[in-house]
Amino acid sequence: MPVIEKKRTRDLPQINERIRFPKIRVIDTDGAQLGIMPPQEALQLAEEKELDLVLISDKADPPVCRIMDYGKYKFEQEKKAREARKKQHTADVKEVKMRYKIEEHDYNVRVKQAERFLKDGDKVKATVMFRGREIQHSDLAEDLLKRMATDLEPFGELQQAPKKEGRNMMMLISPKK
C-alpha cells in the first residue's frame, strides 16, 4: 500500500478556517481596526463581504488578521518577491587584460570596456601581462594602471592598488554606489 504524504499545515497559508487562535485582532479592507474577536466572528464578517480572512502576523499578541481578497494578496507578495530578486545583483569580477606597451586606441577600448562593466555594477580587475624580460618594466605597467584608475574615477573607486602577481600586475576597481 503506497504511503500518502500529508501536506504540512505549516506550508499552507493561514487563511479562513485554518486560523487557529482563540482571539485575533481584525483589520478591515480599508485598514480600519475592527477590534479583537474570535476567528469565527471575523470569518463571518469576511464571508459577508465575499472576501478572505488572512493572517498577517502571528507574532503579535493577539495575532493580526485582515479581511481581504487572498488571491490579490498572494499576487502582491509574489510581485514583491520578484522585484526583490531583480534588485539582488551579485557583483561579478570582470577582467580587462593588456600589455604595458599598449597603443592609445587599444587603451581607450579597454577603458570603455571597464567603464561599461562598472556601470553594470561589476568589479573590474585590470591586468597588465608581462612576457620574458618585460617584467623589468613593472614601473611602466604601474603607471599605466594608475592612469586607468584616474580615467575610471567617475565610475568606480580603487579597491586594490596595483600590485605584482607572478608575471602580471593587477588592480581592482569597484563600482561607485
UniProtKB/Swiss-Prot annotation:
Keywords: Cytoplasm, Initiation factor, Protein biosynthesis. It comes from the Bacteria. It is found in: Cytoplasm. GO terms for biological process: ribosome disassembly. One of its GO terms (cellular component) is cytosol. It holds the Pfam family IF3_C. InterPro entries: T_IF-3_C_sf (IPR036788), T_IF-3_N_sf (IPR036787), Translation_initiation_fac3_CS (IPR019813), Translation_initiation_fac_3 (IPR001288), Translation_initiation_fac_3_C (IPR019815), Translation_initiation_fac_3_N (IPR019814). One of its GO terms (molecular function) is translation initiation factor activity. IF-3 binds to the 30S ribosomal subunit and shifts the equilibrium between 70S ribosomes and their 50S and 30S subunits in favor of the free subunits, thus enhancing the availability of 30S subunits on which protein synthesis initiation begins. Monomer. Belongs to the IF-3 family. This is Translation initiation factor IF-3. It comes from Nostoc punctiforme (strain ATCC 29133 / PCC 73102). The lineage of its organism: Bacteria, Bacillati, Cyanobacteriota, Cyanophyceae, Nostocales.
